[in-house]
Structures are given as C-alpha cells and as structure tokens.
Amino acid sequence: EHPYLLTYTSGTTGRPKGVLHVQGGFLVSITREVAYQADAHPEDVIHFATDMGWIMGPWMVVGGGALGCTLVFAEGAPDRPADRLWRLVEAERVSVLGLSPTLVRALLPNGDPEADLSSLRTLVTTGEPWNPDPYRWLFEQVGGGRCPIINCSGGTEVGACFLSPTPAIPIKACSLGGPALGMAMDVVDPAGNSLVGTGEVGELVCRKPFPGMTRGFWRDPERYLDAYWRRLPGVWVHGDWASADQDGYWFLHGRSDDTLNIAGKRIGPAELESAAVAHPAVAEAAAVGVPHEVKGEVAWIFCVPLPGHEPTDELADEVAARAAAELGKAFRPDRVVFVPALPKTRSAKIVRRAVRAKALGKDPGDLSSVENPEALEDIARAL
C-alpha cells in the first residue's frame, strides 16, 4: 500500500484530478493486463505512441518492464513526418504497438504505410470510441488483417482497464470485447438495473473492488467520492455510456456527461461524430449540445476537413445529411462548423467541454491539460 505513482487525469471533463496509485495493486493490475490482454512476452518489443503524462506511458513501462520486454521510446510527435511511426516500427521491429483512435484518424489521410510492418503481432488501442472506417484501416493496412486489435478502456484512476478483449477470443469490430480479467462490470439504467445482453445504452459501473483502483484523489477526498461513489450506492459509476449486445460484446458510446438530449431523445457524441467522420472529406469531428428554445438542445458538429477539401456550405449540408441518414432526421445537426483543429489533451482526447463553452460564448474553464488551446480561438473565429 506504499504510494507509488501520482498521475493526473486527462482533464476532458474539468480540472485534472491527481490520482494516487500504490505499489502492489498497480503492478499486479498493469502486468496482468499487458501479459494476458495484450499477450506480451519477454521477447516482445513494445511501443505505445504516448508521452508519460498519459497513463498508457506507465502501462508500457510497468507492465512491459515486469515481463522483461524491450521498450521503445520516441520523443516528439508521432506523425511528424507523416510516416514516422511506421518507420519506427520497422526499425525497432516493434511487435506490440499501442496508439489512440485519434492518432489513427490523423494518420489515415496520409495513405497506407509503406514501411515493413511484418514484426507487428498485437495492436492495442484506447482513449476514445472508434469509428468503423479508421478501425478497419488499422486492422487491414497496419495490422495486415492478422493482428488483433485489443481495444480496451479503463482510466487513469482505474490503474488498468475495465473492458478489454484478448487475442484468444473472436473480436467484433469497434467493440471492447467484455469485462477485463477480474473486473465485475455491468451496464445499468438510472435505477441501477442491469442492461447487459439487451443492447440498450446505460451507465458503465463496476460492482466489486479491484487491485489497481486509485486510493483517492490527491488532497481532494470529497471530489473522489463525488466522482464515482455518490450516484448509485455501493458501485463505482465510471461516467461512460456503454452497451452489451446479445452476443456478449461490449461497446462504449462516449462520456455520459457529454450526452446530448435532442427533443427528449438522448444520443452520445460518438454516434454523431462517427457519422460525420464517415464523410470522405472529414478527418475529425466533435459534437456538442447547444440550447434550443423548442427542442431543448440541438447538435453542433465541429469538423476538421481532410487536406484538399475546402470548407463550404455545400459540404456542411452533406455532412449534416449523412448524419441524418445514419441516425434519423431527429438527430440532424443544426450546424456543421469547419475548423483547422480541435482542442485535445496530451493523451489525444478531444476536450468537448471546452468546445461547447466556446460555442456558447462562455469561459472554457481550466485548460491546463489542453495541448493546443489556440484551437479554441479558431473555433471562436469560425462562429
């Protein structure tokens, strides 16, 4: 129980939280995950495209180090030049590669990798929900159609993953498999009733303790209790929308505090963003809810266009029409705004709360975790 690691959350929902982990629990949880979910062995070479400020940095160091793997570090941005990551894999013969969906979406417009990626055996992804096209590209063009995508999700405060597939079982595209080893996970409605197996979207919760869980927030115990323990008695409420289908596969649908409520119909930003990114001219998207006198709330989608595509009213209409076709007319975005970039944390997560604040002309609050705050000024100018 001796303190081991003080690390900070991404800050996507507010001021970053200082998370305290201890020696035994963190080591056990991370090593178990790298060994049995990423299927790493002593002879493997691991590289996770991250900096040490994201929990996936310690994930690689602690788990990979405990297993005796070779660890590859790289300074600077993984996409400058555009093929840098693929050349690194080729040069170091990386076999376990970790990266975020956001990074994959940024790399995809540069074309298929030309480097020799035959050393790859496992792909590990985390950070945000997937869109089908980038997921398929990663599997087919990076992994050669042979490397499993271990799409996992947990959090800085979890000290491991709540949900994760393993290479030993079939994987459904964009899913997270199911509960990670030792995790008593559930999806519940507002009353706490289980929705697992129904495919309905509910809150992701954990019903039993686990070794890697944080011992609390640094000098802020009340915030820790408010964040996870005071919404449903006796369970950890993680703040993610999730579903588990009849085949036993689990999916995430974005943060529950990012949910839009359009004319009484709830939808997560991930669904709207996925529909927007499916347009061949859109690289990235962030969907936020904006107050509306009649509907209560409408969706605005902020899109980053792919190189070679000029933002026009016609293109905005096309993106909105695609969203309506995929999700229903009720969810057609009220506005599509093109911007050069979206504000992101150092772990490549889009800071939707800041996007929404700018859309409403409000103070975006704590931006200490935002790597490119200038993107918010671009948003303000675009409006």
Language model regions located:
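AMP-binding/adenylate-forming catalytic core of the ANL superfamily
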Residues: E90, L97, F210, R215-G216, ...
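Conserved AMP-binding/adenylation subdomain of ANL enzymes
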Residues: L27-V45, I55-S95, N110
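Conserved helix-loop-beta element of the AMP-binding
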Residues: D44-H47, V72, S95-G98, D112-D133, ...
